[in-house]
């Protein structure tokens, strides 16, 4: 069996594209993967095309060998777009390898450890606060403008069966809601240490969410790269009374993150932007996180499983970084089923209504859980006709 053709297609995912890689073989098997090129990596399809040319005529079942060769070919430019491109190619080859063996991907890695994956609703309220017009007109979902809206959102999360939900810093005022992202601007602004007014706004946000959800919903709070370690520490101490399941924070220094972990009164989740075991190892050695977040489209599921094994050796649980589209949900599910040290699976519950129409078989999601697909490969292919009905045309 040899790789014959490689191509990308892109579907409308609302505020970002859903990008899919298709690898066809001369044996009639086709492999798929999803990758993310919309927010930070606009040239990723071109990098994939250039690297994929090197695997034409090769056997996709030797995915580990192919990935090693591709990584060697970009030795002087590791990580970044090159790593993401290699992961996209490898993930599609793994889909083919599992289909050729007649097994689900998790079985290819010796699993599944579990067939039902616990979920959390990611960015709960965050995109409604940022893109109120789109959510109201296109998705038919209410805007998020007031603390009362935040309270109603907490009740909605529980009504939709979620037991865990994650939100981001949102400030409410008479002008509406503002999604706070101070870390996504140039420089190291002193404001990222957070003043009292910002902390009070965040505290009020989480209080409203808790009031609406009740005592049994686990709340995760994601501040991302938004603060200095000092600011993250202030958030952690201020939000202690809300019994967070974790605080999510990212800094580039293993030592600084480890110090922060020792100063906040709740578990710390982090590391979603790292590549490969070598990228994670300094953080594991420093004891920098309670939960290591691993991006399957960026790393490839094979390397993600290896990262999870390294985390397990340091007594650390893992969770997939998964704010992507429909096929990435399946990829994340197979990762979650392939490792013993799973914490929980991320999913976007506020998404376009045609999301799972883009798959040939929709996943089963109910009562805060995701059922692992049973069919060979990822368990579904990309529905190319549906993609054609919802093309990405926003650049």
Model-predicted segments: where are they?
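Metal- or metallocofactor-binding catalytic centers and their adjacent structured scaffolds
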Residues: 24-101, 107
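Metal-dependent enolase-superfamily TIM-barrel catalytic cores that perform enediolate-based chemistry
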Residues: 116, 121-258
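Structured beta-strand/loop patches that form or line metal/cofactor-binding pockets in enzymes
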Residues: 1-32, 36-37, 352-356
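Short amphipathic alpha-helices and their capping/turn segments at secondary-structure boundaries
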Residues: 97, 102-104, 150-161, 379
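Conserved, mostly hydrophobic/aromatic
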Residues: 3, 28, 51, 89, ...
């Amino acid at each position: 069996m040899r790789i014959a053709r490689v191509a990308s297609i892109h579907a409308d995912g609302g505020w970002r594209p859903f990008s899919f890689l298709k690898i066809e073989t001369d044996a009639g098997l086709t492999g798929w993967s999803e990758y993310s090129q919309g927010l930070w990596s606009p040239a990723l399809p071109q990098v994939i095309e250039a690297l994929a040319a090197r695997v034409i005529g090769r056997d996709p079942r030797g995915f580990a060998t192919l990935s090693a060769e591709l990584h060697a070919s970009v030795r002087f430019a590791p990580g970044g777009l090159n790593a993401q491109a290699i992961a996209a190619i490898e993930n599609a080859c793994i889909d083919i390898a599992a289909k050729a063996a007649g097994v689900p991907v998790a079985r290819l890695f010796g699993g599944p450890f579990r067939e039902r994956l616990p979920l959390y609703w990611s960015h709960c309220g965050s995109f409604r606060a940022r893109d109120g017009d789109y959510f109201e007109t296109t998705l038919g979902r209410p805007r998020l403008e007031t603390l009362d809206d935040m309270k109603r959102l907490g009740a909605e999360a529980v009504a939709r069966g979620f037991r865990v939900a994650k939100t981001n810093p949102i400030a409410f005022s008479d002008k509406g809601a503002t999604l706070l992202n101070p870390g996504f601007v140039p420089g190291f602004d002193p404001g990222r240490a957070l003043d009292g007014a910002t902390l009070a706004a965040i505290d009020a946000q989480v209080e409203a969410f808790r009031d609406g959800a009740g005592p049994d919903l686990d709340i995760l709070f994601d501040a991302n790269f938004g603060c200095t370690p000092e600011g993250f520490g202030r958030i952690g101490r201020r939000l202690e009374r809300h019994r967070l399941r974790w605080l999510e924070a990212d800094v580039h220094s293993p030592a600084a993150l480890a110090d922060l972990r020792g100063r906040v009164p709740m578990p710390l989740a982090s590391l979603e932007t790292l590549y490969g075991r070598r990228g994670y190892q300094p953080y594991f050695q420093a004891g920098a996180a309670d939960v290591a977040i691993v991006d399957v489209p960026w790393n490839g599921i094979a390397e993600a499983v290896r990262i999870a094994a390294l985390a397990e050796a340091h007594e650390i649980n893992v969770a997939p970084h998964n704010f992507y589209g429909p096929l990435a949900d399946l990829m994340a599910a197979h990762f979650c089923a392939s490792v013993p040290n799973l914490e929980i699976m991320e999913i976007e519950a506020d998404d376009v209504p045609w999301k799972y129409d883009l798959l040939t078989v929709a996943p089963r999601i109910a009562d805060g859980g995701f059922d692992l697909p049973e069919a060979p490969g990822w368990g579904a292919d990309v529905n190319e006709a549906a993609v054609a009905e919802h093309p990405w045309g926003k650049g």
